[in-house]
A protein has these predicted regions:
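Carbohydrate-binding surfaces of carbohydrate-active enzymes
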Residues: 2-90, 104, 126-127, 131-132, ...
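Short, surface-exposed beta-strand/loop micro-motifs that present aromatic residues
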Residues: 26-31, 116-117, 169
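Disordered, acidic Ser/Thr/Pro-rich linker "stalks" and the adjacent N-terminal cap
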Residues: 60-125, 131-139, 158, 162-164, ...
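Short, conserved beta-strand segments of beta-strand-rich sandwich/propeller modules, principally
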Residues: 127, 177-179
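Short, surface-exposed beta-strand/strand-loop-strand elements in extracellular ectodomains
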Residues: 138-151
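Short, surface-exposed tryptophan/glycine-enriched loops
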Residues: 166-177
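Short beta-strand-plus-loop segments that form exposed binding edges in beta-rich domains
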Residues: 181-188
Length: 202
């Protein structure tokens, strides 16, 4: 996605009060990077050859918020198990090991499966990041994310493709368990990373 922080691609002094806001840029981030796309942000240089202070202040705040949003991966505090595993080399634990070269995989004939995260204690969550092992292709066609609230599973998000990265945002849920289900895939699913966060945007 190609977006400029200002109305145009070049600096104009009369546009100093038209710089995109922090909320606008965060929205672009989550609708591009968060949906399996890239984000090319144009930042025009002013007549001094520098980024204008207004632009810089917005960018620094966006960076601060994003760093905080992804700072703590709550999934790493949970016990993770999967409904199907190809073998110990493709265990569900690879989803939270921080290694981009490892991944969870199901048996060849299995195209629908789920992974469950047990936090042991009630945990506040409002963001969920998932990545496919994209070196072997994009496979997932439909998925569901559920939280165990009270005494039942409640759907908090659904979607279709994942690809390199999908970030789901939803109202904060206080839950002890999360379940991510791949409802449909072109071939056996391969997931390399899952992160759960509690962000301040809710």
């Amino acid at each position: 996605m190609n977006v400029s922080i200002r109305p145009g691609w070049f600096y104009h002094e009369e546009q100093d009060d038209q710089v995109k806001t922090v909320d606008q840029l965060l929205d672009v981030y989550y609708h591009s990077v968060g949906r399996n796309a890239t984000w090319n942000l144009n930042i025009p240089i002013d007549e001094r050859g520098l980024v204008h202070p207004t632009d810089s202040a917005v960018l620094m705040e966006v960076a601060k918020i994003l760093q905080n949003n992804f700072k703590e991966n709550l999934a790493q505090q949970a016990e993770v198990r999967a409904s199907n595993v190809r073998g110990k080399d493709f265990a569900a634990a690879h989803l939270i090991d921080g290694n981009k070269d490892s991944y969870w995989a199901t048996d060849d004939e299995v195209t629908s499966a789920s992974v469950e995260f047990d936090f042991k204690v009630p945990t506040a969550i409002n963001q969920f990041l998932v990545q496919e092992y994209i070196r072997l292709g994009q496979r997932v066609k439909a998925f569901t994310l559920e939280a165990f609230v009270g005494d039942e599973w409640q759907v908090v998000a659904t979607g279709s493709t994942i690809g390199y990265k999908r970030i789901l945002r939803f109202p904060t849920v206080e839950t002890q368990k999360l379940r991510f289900t791949i409802n449909e895939a072109k071939a056996c699913p391969l997931l390399s990373n899952i992160e759960c966060n509690c962000c301040s945007y809710d």
